Amino acid sequence: MSAVELILLQRVENLGQMGDVVKVKPGYARNFLLPQGKAIRANALNRERFERERVQLEALNLKRREEAERLSERMHGLSVVLIRQAGDSGSLYGSVTTRDIAEAATAAGLTVARTQVILENPIKQLGLYDVRVALHPEVSIPVTVNVARSEEEAERQARGEEIGVEKEEPSGFVEEALEETVEAPAEA
């Protein structure tokens, strides 16, 4: 399978900066970079077009980045509360998704698409989590996600108090102290 050459129209994490000519697998180009408008094919016509439009693209990118930086200053320290059902051990019935976090952030005044929410690990327990929201490819802010069973529990978690989560006992084990010793038969 051969690689496809593309010109990046914006910074793409783990790939390159705007204007870089990169080689990627055809599926990555076809399914992500091209449809999202993050890159164009690197043929002679597109290279000329990109060089002509480079100044406008860089100016547009700079404007968007400045808007994202202003928004990040305004929204720094944002915290959202998600109320979910959970078992006694603190395990959620389901998990918190990027869509849930995006909707909660939008309700808190930060318009966010679910694709902008970056979850390092799935959220499947009650507690406080730091999640990154990418406002621009070069600007991201931390958002604290407070997952609790009720508003009162969320307030206690935010203050740093331990919530009443019972520890699960391993099933099938009964703790008994046996003082019986088994002696090996003496060999004659």
Curated annotation (Swiss-Prot):
- Where are the annotated segments for Disordered? 149-188
An example GO BP is: translation
Q: Which GO terms describe its cellular component?
A: ribonucleoprotein complex; ribosome
From start to end residue, where is composition biased (Basic and acidic residues)?
149-170
Question: Which keywords does this Swiss-Prot/TrEMBL entry list?
Answer: Ribonucleoprotein, Ribosomal protein, RNA-binding, rRNA-binding
Q: Which InterPro entries match?
A: Ribosomal_bL9, Ribosomal_bL9/RNase_H1_N, Ribosomal_bL9_bac/chp, Ribosomal_bL9_C, Ribosomal_bL9_C_sf, Ribosomal_bL9_N, Ribosomal_bL9_N_sf
**Entry-linked Gene3D superfamilies:** Ribosomal protein L9, C-terminal domain, Ribosomal protein L9, N-terminal domain
Tell me which domain of life the UniProt entry assigns to the organism this sequence originates from: Bacteria
The record's section on PROSITE patterns has: RIBOSOMAL_L9
- A GO molecular-function annotation: structural constituent of ribosome
Family from the record:
Belongs to the bacterial ribosomal protein bL9 family.
* NCBIfam families named in the record: L9
Primary role: Binds to the 23S rRNA.
- Alphabetized HAMAP family for the sequence: Ribosomal_bL9 (MF_00503)
Q: What name appears for this protein in its UniProt entry?
A: Large ribosomal subunit protein bL9
